[in-house]
Amino acid sequence: MTIKNEIKHLKRKIDKNFFQKDYTSISDIKDYQVKISKNPRPRLNLLITSMNSQDVYAGIKSAVDFFVKFKKFDIDLRIIVMGKRIDESSLYPVPDFTFIKDYPIENDNDSKIICDSSKNCSSLFIRERDYFLSTMWFTAYNADSILNKQEKLFGKRMPMVYLIQDYEPGFYPWSSEYLLAESTYHLENQLVVFNSRYLKDYFDKNGYVFEKSFYFDPVLNENLRNVLNLNGNSNIERKNRILFYGRPSKARNAFQLICMALEKWSLLDENSSQWEIYSAGEDLKDVKLKNNLVIKSLGKMSVENYAKFMLESKIGISLMVSPHPSYPPLEMATFGMKVLTNSFVTKDISDFNENIKSIEHININRLAEELHRLTTAQTDYKVLKNDNYVNGVSQIDTIVDNIGLYLKFQKCEV
């Protein structure tokens, strides 16, 4: 037996004796102890993966912002955390909401609460008119189980609202999680809200059918908008700088493909040494390329620094291996950078504005060649303000009104 095989054998033995995997459960799927609440008031429950401040950005922040829009109705609101345990010291503040640590039945009369149901077999009080707003796929899977229990207790299963922000089976290899995530798109009586028309087009093309479906277009982050309105018309000199969205921990952002294409480009372009390359998104060690070029890591930037960096840079790269458009390419293009991204089945975001080039069937050579085209061209870099995107005009308020009407929520009296 070779040393390599001996090590493999030893590893299997250690795994078997000390790290035996539990094949009878998936940690995100919960079995809640549902208890009856006789409170007759309607309530909408946000099912979320975390409410710890360090986690509340991107998709979680979008979900919370969408949920609080329902304050306009005369209903109770409850945030149920199903993923990470709540850390009180870093709880994300939601105006008017109170965190209930121990959840006795008396607290089911509170109108706006946050509760921690991250632990399996947690108790959960359910009303006859409880509705659920699911976010990540396993919150929808858990909601389905709760709704089945609601039907047994009260004789009626309420519709479920499902905010879909990506095609989540794609987060996994073909596996149990893949199948379970995909199954949530077939649950009965769903009101589905997509966070872009590109994502909705993908679901439509693949034959998914829902009771009702809506989509809203992304809008520019308010803080970025403020910087753009202050500085977007000024004559800022742009540097020979390439900025890309670098998140190696998220396979769908294709970090390796970008790095390999940058190395290929550095050999194609005889003036590549005149360019600086930066990665933003995750804290990384610098990556050395050939021709003595280095990808310098900026990590997670403040909004102000990110905005300033975009206004001073010429080229952006942001890939997303999913039907979700992602926000960095839209932001970079709005701030006047020439942006390279990828198409994906029904997604082609080059229609957003003329600063974006969406590459079909992207590979290392194609990305390197498109980058070479940009670094050797005489180009005017112009801030392009898509009015609805920059001014925050979206369909969200109309969608919330339509959902409220369908669920027979009454508007609050002014």
What are these regions (language model features)?
Residues 188-227:
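Donor nucleotide-sugar binding/catalytic pocket of nucleotide-sugar-dependent glycosyltransferases
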Residues 362, 376-413:
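A charged, aromatic-enriched C-terminal amphipathic alpha-helix characteristic of glycosyltransferases
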Residues 59-62, 186, 205, 220-297, ...:
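Conserved catalytic-core segment of nucleotide-activated headgroup transferases in glycan assembly
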Residues 126-128, 175-193:
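Membrane-proximal helix-turn-helix segments that form the acceptor-binding/catalytic region
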Residues 338-342:
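Short hydrophobic beta-strand element within catalytic cores of glycosyltransferases
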Residues 130, 311-324:
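Acidic donor-binding loop of glycosyltransferase active sites
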Residues 25-33, 169-175, 214-238:
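Acidic anion/phosphate-binding donor-loop and adjacent secondary structure
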